Amino acid sequence: MHSRREASAAPFSHASAAVLWGLPLFRHVPEAVHVSDARHNGVVRHARGVARHEVSVPDDDIVVIGGIPCTSLERTVFDVARTLPLASAVAVADAALRLVAWDPEDRVYDQGAASTWATAMEERIARARGARGIRQARWIMAFADGRAQLPGESMSRLLLHDLGFATPRLQVRLADSSHLYFVDFGLDDAKAWGEFDGEGKYTDAQFRGERTPWEVVRAEKEREDWIRATTHRPLVRWGMQHLASPVTLGRRLAEFGIRPPR
């Protein structure tokens, strides 16, 4: 597809740019490759598997990744936040903030970097008042959090919000002199902990390293026992099968006596 459009200066954009940036397209399968140019502002034309957004893209909103021109991270999130379904767009915004502010080595979130980037995005959104999807984009940027590690955690955040839980703490650090653990969700209003379990934690060598699946399960059990005994809070796990709807996740939490305060 790239060879068919090399003669054009139009950069890849929207979901296609998100792919180039390594951002997850959670529950969204693009039907076309997206590019943007400035022929007729606001029109989207589809031809031969290409969706051409005829909108202006300034030079400082164009970067090159692997030799391929695409929209900048900020412009990509701006476009996606306005045009993709809410869950897909939140996963993209969370992942973009993670690129900006998360240090994977030290597991530290640079709140200053995150705030600076979010403010720039808010200013961009404010300048586009009245554009298609701008209300959703504004909500998403206020909701986005780069501490969400996986798209399933982003979706979990949305469903917890819909269920009426207070904003959870993410990647909560729990430690004593001999232990250091991180928990995905601190559900403080329910005095509980939550964990989203992607299947890769137990099966993907990238996540489990040299350990066998059984060794991973045993280490997780020891970790959970320590967290429960130390914090005196329940810990509930859920997986992708529980993210079908707020009701589905709510039922999973209720099995452990965890409900949003009324």
Regions found by a protein language model. Give the residues of each.
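Surface segments flanking catalytic/ligand-binding clefts of nucleic-acid enzymes
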Residues: 8, 101-262
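Short gly/ser-rich loop at a beta-strand->alpha-helix junction or flexible surface loop bordering the NTP-binding
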Residues: 1-133, 149, 260-262
